Structures are given as structure tokens and as C-alpha cells.
Swiss-Prot record:
Annotated InterPro entries: ITPase, ITPase-like_fam, RdgB/HAM1
pH dependence, entry free text: Optimum pH is 10.
Main location: cytoplasm
Family: Belongs to the HAM1 NTPase family.
Keyword Metal-binding part of the UniProt annotation: yes
GO MF annotation list: dITP diphosphatase activity; identical protein binding; ITP diphosphatase activity; metal ion binding; nucleoside triphosphate diphosphatase activity; nucleotide binding; XTP diphosphatase activity
Assembly description: Homodimer.
Name under which the protein is recorded: Inosine triphosphate pyrophosphatase
Residues binding Mg(2+): E44
Tissue specificity statement from the Swiss-Prot or TrEMBL entry: Ubiquitous. Highly expressed in heart, liver, sex glands, thyroid and adrenal gland.
Pfam families from the UniProt entry: Ham1p_like
Positions bound to ITP: 14-19, 56, 72-73, 89, 149-152, 172, 177-178
Swiss-Prot/TrEMBL catalytic activity: ITP + H2O = IMP + diphosphate + H(+); dITP + H2O = dIMP + diphosphate + H(+); XTP + H2O = XMP + diphosphate + H(+); N(6)-hydroxy-dATP + H2O = N(6)-hydroxy-dAMP + diphosphate + H(+)
Amino acid sequence: MAASLVGKKIVFVTGNAKKLEEVVQILGDKFPCTLVAQKIDLPEYQGEPDEISIQKCQEAVRQVQGPVLVEDTCLCFNALGGLPGPYIKWFLEKLKPEGLHQLLAGFEDKSAYALCTFALSTGDPSQPVRLFRGRTSGRIVAPRGCQDFGWDPCFQPDGYEQTYAEMPKAEKNAVSHRFRALLELQEYFGSLAA
């Protein structure tokens, strides 16, 4: 699958310039494809993270008619059985980072994990969608740091005293759930060269 993509342009489905910047920075200049951001209105599917990622990727392929990379991110609170999970966008929109923190006010367990899933398609609907996942464990804290990138101000990864929002970009990009998923993607493309 990936061999047919080497040297080609892949549409990265996002309207978020910061997300594209972060992805390109993590992948580096050795990534064998060119990512081009395109904002596409995709339905907000419901279900498990893998199902949602596959459905989003298939719909993006239908609209783009070519190779696509779609990202879906979850923030899962252990005390809430994994919620908000794939619905974090809606929780964040209504509650902001402070409200996410307050959701756990009645719980001792503040642990959480961030899950990033990238879904890749060659653009051929008959070929399977390939998934790449990254997970970072941490805890939900009172928001600290810059408030301009989603829930970063209230997620503190395990082993760190800073939230994602307080970390220098390079440090965050070396430990984030997105980094781990993109590392899987890089390894997949790298295995073709071996």
C-alpha cells in the first residue's frame, strides 16, 4: 500500500494550521510524501475510535478522489470509563479546558490518556484503510500555559511537571500521542526502504 504513495502528494484532512505544522515538524524532511492540508467537512461519526477513523478516511477518499491522511484524537478520562473519548471536540467546545478539569472534581482518579489515530488510504476505495495509533498517559489538571490549542492546557503527561501547553513545542512533539502515532506511520514507510 505505502509503496504506491512514495513520492506522492497526500491530502491531510485538517483545517487547523497548528495541527499541520505539528505533523510536518514531527515527520521531518525524510518523510517520502508531501502532505497538503485541505479542510473537508466530514460527518462526526459515533462509535469506537478505530471505526470512526476508518469511516472518516473513507468519506475523505470519496470527496478527494486521491490519497488521504485523516487524524482523529481522543481524550479519555479513566474515572469516566473513557469519556469524553472521541467526543472531546464537543466537550471542549462547550466546557473549555477549565470545564474538562472540573468534570473530574468529584473523582479521586484524575488519570487520563490521549489517543491519536491516523488513518491512511491510497485513494483506492477497494484497498483497506491503514491505522496508526499513539497513546500517551497522563492526568487532568487545572489549565496552565497557552490556551490556544485545544485541551493541551489541562493534560499533563506522566513523568512531567508541565502540561502539553507549557512544554516547548519540540519537547511536546517528542512525547505526544500524535508523535507516537506518526512514529508508527514513519516506521511503516521506512519498512518499505529496508
